[in-house]
Amino acid sequence: MNTKHTLFALLLAISSASGWSQSKIQVTMDLNKVIHDQVTVTVKVPVNSASTLLYSVPKIIPGTYSEDDYGKYIEQFKALDANGKPLTVTKTDVNTWQINNANKAKTITYQVNDTYDIEDTHEIFSPAGSNIEAGKNFMINTHAFIGYFEGFAQNPYELTVLHPEQLWGATALTDLDASKNKDVFVTNRYASLVEHPIMYAQPDYTTFTVQGMEILIAVYSPNRKVTAASITPEMKQMMTAQKNFLGDFNATKKYAVLLYLSDNTKPDAEGFGALEHPTSTTVVMPEMLPIDELKEQLKDVVSHEFFHIVTPLSIHSKEIANFDYNNPKMSQHLWMYEGVTEYFANLFQINQGLITEAEFYKRMAGKMANASTMNDQMPFTKMSANVLTKPYKDQYLNVYEKGALIAMCLDIEIREKSLGKRGILDLMKQLSKEYGAEKAFDDAELFAKITALTYPEIGIFLEKYINGPTPIAYADYFAKMGVTQTMVASEGNIFIKEQAPLLTINPDTKEILFIPHAPLHPFLKNLGVEGGDVLVAINGTKYSLDNINELILWSTTLQENDEVTFTTKRNGVEKNTTAKAVLPKEMIPGFEFTDTAKSALKEAWLKG
């Protein structure tokens, strides 16, 4: 018997039996014909012998941990046979359509609405949403436009995008079509497709290479206030520092940053921040943000998302590897996916000299203060596994506060046990070698693996503070590095005093008022402001209830000695007063290095 021939025949038979699972899912998106602010999507139905076939778009996507129901934004769903005749379709839930006589189906087609201009009607985080602005911009988070057939999510996807010649698609994907008005992208499965956002706009991008990684920075600024070139030097400095911090850790050869700047003069995106993907990040920020403040925000926001190349890209559980977009089982380890990532986004900045030691301590103290407002006795693993439901979902933001502090304490514990030679970054590199992007771990095995790679005391920490309800005494961990608690000076906000706001609203006129008899800061008094005055404008920009969020945002960007002109109104009379800003100073709980006997250990922690 020819064993090789028989084996080949067997493989061929298996392949034929499941041949439909190997066919390419072909999707076409037409950005040329935008009707009623909608884009048409056409999907070829894979060859099948089923009487019914389900097509779903995500209810949930990785990284958001919220139920967003993208099916709400799909209309006119049709299934057609080879002759273009409609087949019966039944909508089984908000995100799923059942195609009857599926073996006769040739294509499906539907219209997709965007989310940015209707953000008052939903809670989708803007970086996970979509924008359709004919001829100008298309923010295509692919999960908002494209779904999957049941049983075919592992098939390769071929996405063809027809677009106006003046628009260019920024993405980490490779365009396989050389024409100016059509792009073709291929991914190995649906999960890969939804991890690759694309932003179409008039070309405004830069590229640079950092240690073998190609970085793309693409910007859409509707009023041309910001360009990719204007932020690239700071982005290059930051990402170079990140790669230096990571050392020999390599996870991807290309990374794209897609920055959408929201126009506050019209209905537009309001959820500012970013959403990570393995080889890219989508970022949404207000266009009115001063350029220097935008650069600072990007340094923190993008660095967090970039560090996701460590986890979950290179280290993740089976729940993430086999993510069910409509009925997911959540992993227990958000402390790692988000907490370690957030810690790295701060640690690398002190490690690479981008911030001072005092600033690093201030940031960690701020996280302690924020975490203190959350449930400190809720086991992090339990919260993580149940993050989609109350009361656990209400604690999600703690992954960026207590989650980062957990990572810091683990880092300190490992540094202490290894006499400064190893830290949590070394642990993550070991875990990456153990698993990597293609090998997922069992949720229940991770703590044992970490313990085996480190010390028994680390296992005790994991069970007590992450799997258990015990609050962490953070000051004790700082003390291990020679850092002690103290009161430190901090610059406050001119519209807040003793944690109380100084502004209120007249509901009848929508005017912003200084609260009568409120204890104003000296700077405001020097401007002649009194309680009860109406705040009409600052530096010529008028404010009211309608744009009070912009006023609050402005106040956070105010720097010492900035020249400021206040327009106030008292008894119907307006007055302009100009002065240099003097920010209020307050003493807040913080940390400083005091034990010189531990200098070497502290240096290994922050600079090693």
How would you name each of these model-derived features?
Residues I60, A102, N113-T115, P164, ...:
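Solvent-exposed coil/turn segments that connect beta secondary-structure elements
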Residues D204-H333:
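Juxtacatalytic substrate-recognition/specificity segment
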Residues K44, E67-Q76, L80-T240, N244-T252, ...:
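Non-catalytic architectural context of zinc metalloproteases
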Residues A345-N346, L354-G608:
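C-terminal recognition in membrane/secretory proteostasis and scaffolding
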Residues Q22-I60, N141-A144:
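Early extracytoplasmic/domain-onset interaction patches
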Residues M1-Q26:
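Bacterial Sec-dependent N-terminal signal peptides
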Residues F77, Q242, M336-F348:
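An active-site-proximal "capping" alpha-helix that borders the catalytic cofactor pocket
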Residues K24-Q26, Q38-T42, T52-L54, A105-T107, ...:
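Intrinsic-disorder/low-complexity, polar/charged segments enriched in Ser/Thr/Lys/Arg/Asp/Glu/Gln
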